[in-house]
């Protein structure tokens, strides 16, 4: 059976007050609306038409809801979490752990007796959080380390006072040392460095680094004593166009800046932060999970059949574009369908749910193919 989901909107301070309401076709209430969660994460599970949460239904009978193979492979846990994400302000500089790192970190936090909902707890669960974000409008982000020669060229072009040692570190290939030094610097030392960077950015004339200049100017003004501003110097600054994507495996350092997107991740809430945030920051733990291999080309596009190929073992995602026709999406395992434009009918063996933009539906593991009809665009997320 395919059923409609009722989803929770998270009101994190960085959220846009207008982007999600506009997508949903409702009046904004003036408050930030950052993320709409679709899935069975215990923090904010979707609700089924009968009032049960998807988390409770999965917990009661994983094999019936997920299918026997998926239930066994993911230890009875719903494998993925989907979100609509609307960033009005920058999110934190962050990375996510691998499965082994998450298990180890979770066991350490449990042994230390840190409550699972404590602000200073790093590992909320024992699962990794690889994720993909697909832009629904132009979306700005910092993603992965820029190749070192490009970062040296950026620093040479800006020539901020006091950054000579950093530039030399990068020329010598010492990215880990440079990132760790930046993120570990106290705020009294950071403030004049951010000030010098802001002055250099204001005086920069040229178009080779226009996106970088725009972002650094805003970060220097908004976070004058935050080491995350300096870390931003080291990351790829990208702008995704509609339906472009970025895939973030374990260890990828990133920060979303602004825009509306559809996001899918493994079913985890493990985030290790290093800056650009008022939330808990743990630099040594962040550095311990970071992948310091530079990322040359972060942008991912869909294949001809609409599939975004990530290789992630926790989920698969396909975009379906319809112009009055029908598409049969084969597959097994639990699926979430989210309409992002127009009106889509999502059906299974016994039922059909009509979805408008921002609405979603769930099909259980044994349901069989999912049939989509209508005019618009939708994402179909399934277990890998």
Description of each model-found segment:
Residues 1-205, 278-296, 317:
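Transition-metal
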Residues 59-71, 225-241, 329-330, 336-356:
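A short beta-strand-loop-beta hairpin characteristic of the jelly-roll/cupin
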Residues 89, 341-384:
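Generic C-terminus detector
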Residues 91, 132-141, 258-278, 315, ...:
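A short hydrophobic beta-strand segment most commonly corresponding to one strand
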Residues 188-232:
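Active-site cores enriched in adjacent His and Asp/Glu residues with nearby glycine-rich loops
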Residues 235-247, 252-256, 348-367:
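Short acidic-glycine-tyrosine-enriched beta hairpin
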Residues 259-307:
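C-terminal, non-catalytic macromolecule-binding modules
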Residues 313-331:
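Conserved short histidine dyad/triad with adjacent acidic residue
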